[in-house]
Curated annotation (Swiss-Prot):
Keywords assigned by UniProt, alphabetized: Amidation, Amphibian defense peptide, Antibiotic, Antimicrobial, Secreted
Protein name per UniProt: Maculatin-3.1
Gene source species: Ranoidea genimaculata
Highest rank taxon of the organism: Eukaryota
Recorded GO CC terms: extracellular region
Annotated compartments: Secreted
Tissue: Expressed by the skin dorsal glands.
Residue numbers of Alanine amide PTMs: A26
Described purpose of this protein according to its UniProt entry: Shows antibacterial activity against S.uberis.
GO BP term (any one): defense response to bacterium
Length: 26
């Protein structure tokens, strides 16, 4: 459903943000 799609997109954005942050800190 729509909520599942939104949840998956939020999770992928979160992991992307974490990757960017760790890239900045490295």
């Amino acid at each position: 459903g729509l909520l599942q799609t939104i949840k998956e997109k939020l999770e992928s954005l979160e992991s992307l943000a974490k990757g960017i942050v760790s890239g900045i800190q490295a």
